[in-house]
Amino acid sequence: MSDEEILEAELVDSAEETLLATPTNIGPLSRIQALAIALVLLLLSSTILYAILSTKETLEEEVSEVLVVDTGIFVTNSSGMSIDIPPLDMKFNSSSVGEDAAEPSIGITSSGCIFFIAFEKVMRSCDYGVSWEEVQDPVQCAPTTSDPYGWVDPVTDRIFNVQMMGLETSWICWSDNDGQTWFGNPHDSGTTPINDHIKLATGPWTNSGYGLIGQLSQNAYETAVYYCYNKLAGIFCYTSIDGGATFELGGQIIGLATTNGGLHGAISTAPDGTVYVTPRVETPTVIVSDDNGFSWFERTMGEDVGTPYPRKNSEVSTDSESNAYHVWTGADEGIYLAKSTDSGESWTQESIRVSPVEVISTAFPQTDAGDPGRFAVTYLGSENASILGESDLDGNPWNGNGHYAPNGVHYHLYVTFSLNALDDEPVFHTRRLTTDPVQVGAICLNSGDCRSDQGGSNRNLLDFNDLHIDREGRVFIAIADGCTGECATKETPTPADSRDKLGMMFMLDYGPSLYVANGDLPPINTTASTNQSNVFIPIIDVEAIREDYDD
């Protein structure tokens, strides 16, 4: 471009200027100047307004997002209400056992090997659930089962595999070397045939009753072995003086357990030798022996909260000083606790709610304890409060009873810790451990009266799960998972999708030990070899957005 062209563009010949009108002023400014300033202000204000509106929209979006975040973490008081106390720092890992496993039992030997017993199989993991192998003996142990149970003696490390053979008898086999070799008795159910709902446990000998015999037999086996079962109208309990090889001492427990049908939960024992059996009855009750099963007495509690119908097993755990903790599902479907500090002679009568009020339906409470006041409870539960009052499987307004739960109810696995359960104002720390449901819809809680057959019977989970701690005070949980595969990934799974019974183990990775001396347990090293299948699943302790919980 030439200089002349530039001059022609920039210069105006004054002779050719024509004024159409005389400019007027607005104050000290000309009209043109005022208009320019007004346009600038308009643009500036619109920019500011846009920024404000955008910020408001962003904040609204952020608030909306926070409202649907579900942490699955609760800290509650003795009424189940939230309190302003920091939650315990803990994380759980899970592991698929790879086998069907309704009614599982779990135990841990001093070597760290985990034994998961369900149906006729004994599954062992010595690498904290990275891998599992079947270890029961094909000759010494039962090839089939009608009802399974397992137990690891925390004193001797003996592993018991108990299998009911029809209703006639039970076949018990045992191992003293982490399942490498086994011995068994195919007719090991006491002096009287016909048994059901079998349970086994071990505990110290006392100085009275059968303990007088046990004191002489400790060279044969250090602890007493108890075997209880239901037979028609009552509970029968036997005591073995030879490590469970035979059960010659004992018989029927008389009293309330007999008059109410006799179904019962797990056997529990305390360091002082006290034995507890929990009958499945309307008023929460514990049957107690302080002489190794020679005699029994019963104690009731929980009349302020009652029990639902149909009802499942309650359970007792005991701590290192023989304090006892009885947990059960109340009539309002919460998990409740009564405590005894005198070996079962007396129990607190004002029931304590263990589960958060947000968990409105529960089943299968299982418990274990470490040092005084330090115990854990696991259970299945639902937070679908919005479904309360909707039509249940019988067409009545649903009140939280899992037996009649509508199809939209999702049950998850929970664990609750307390480190001060003996205090007047205990604190409960609860975590939801599953990110997809364990069961969708109703759980059959009465074997002769299942209400749903969508996709098959909803009796798939059977009667119980299990929880035990190891020598470090680390919590291990065994469950049957009814919602696996496609069911676990669907946005809206149905009851028909939820008919599995896959064995799953949940284990405290890091967090508080139930033994004070061990403090907070560090993470477990679960490094898997390259040829292992993906059975080990870390449960990441982060907030997750899900649609199957209520606000």
Name each region found by the language model.
Residues M1-V63, P538:
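Secretory targeting signatures
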Residues E61-D551:
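C-terminal PAP-associated
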